From Swiss-Prot:
HAMAP family: Ribosomal_uL6_B (MF_01365_B)
Sequence similarity: Belongs to the universal ribosomal protein uL6 family.
Pfam families, A to Z: Ribosomal_L6
Subunit structure: Part of the 50S ribosomal subunit.
Transmembrane segments: none
Keywords: Ribonucleoprotein, Ribosomal protein, RNA-binding, rRNA-binding
SUPFAM superfamilies assigned to the protein according to its UniProt record, in alphabetical order: Ribosomal protein L6
Gene Ontology cellular component terms for the protein in this record: cytosolic large ribosomal subunit
UniProt keyword RNA-binding, yes or no: yes
GO-annotated molecular function: rRNA binding; structural constituent of ribosome
Gene of this entry: rplF
Name of protein: Large ribosomal subunit protein uL6
Its job: This protein binds to the 23S rRNA, and is important in its secondary structure. It is located near the subunit interface in the base of the L7/L12 stalk, and near the tRNA binding site of the peptidyltransferase center.
Length: 178
């Protein structure tokens, strides 16, 4: 048995989980998410818990067992509490501002960079150097934050660029002068 997959998922008050064929729909106070289930995996809801099972012990079924359980648990947490990622902008002249739903970033290029939010993800700005990416889908929030970070990764000599708030940038020593 998968150690992760065999654990039941508690359904909190205010969250509803429905299984329709190969689709699991999870609805909560912040919204609803849908998850397609693989053929080898079975999902059942009984007395306030979600149980994930598998049909056989093949390698793919074992892998999908734990994955499916983790995805359902993430969706249950997302529709109840939501997910946020915080990014910081470090560097002279580097700043961010919000134009409607979009972000406008000044990253040292000759032009501003605009970032459109993906569906289900919203952007927030604190000051002119902090970006807050939030939403109910953990994967969408992580991908949106990673795509913003990718625009200007933190460089190791001065540390300027876009970084996660909890990220530690390894610094290198510059070349020694004479």
């Amino acid at each position: 048995m998968s150690r992760v997959g065999k654990l039941p998922i508690e359904i909190p008050v205010g969250v509803e989980v429905c299984v329709n064929g190969r689709t699991v729909s999870i609805t909560g106070p912040k919204g609803s998410l849908y998850l397609d289930i693989a053929e080898q995996i079975g999902v059942s809801v009984s007395d306030g818990k979600v149980l994930v099972s598998r049909s056989d012990d093949s390698r793919t079924a074992r892998a999908l067992h734990g994955l499916t359980r983790a995805l359902i648990a993430n969706n249950v947490h997302g529709v109840l509490h939501g997910y946020t990622k915080t990014l910081e902008i470090v560097g002279t002249g580097y700043r961010v501002s919000k134009k409607g739903e979009n972000l406008e970033l000044a990253l040292g290029f000759s032009h501003p960079v605009f970032v459109d939010p993906v569906p289900g993800v919203s952007f927030g700005v604190e000051g002119n150097s902090k970006i807050i990416v939030s939403g109910i889908d953990k994967q969408a929030v992580g991908e949106a934050a990673a795509s913003i970070r990718k625009l200007s990764k933190p460089e190791p000599y001065k540390g300027k660029g876009i970084r996660y708030s909890d990220e530690i940038v390894r610094r290198k020593v510059g070349k020694a002068g004479k």
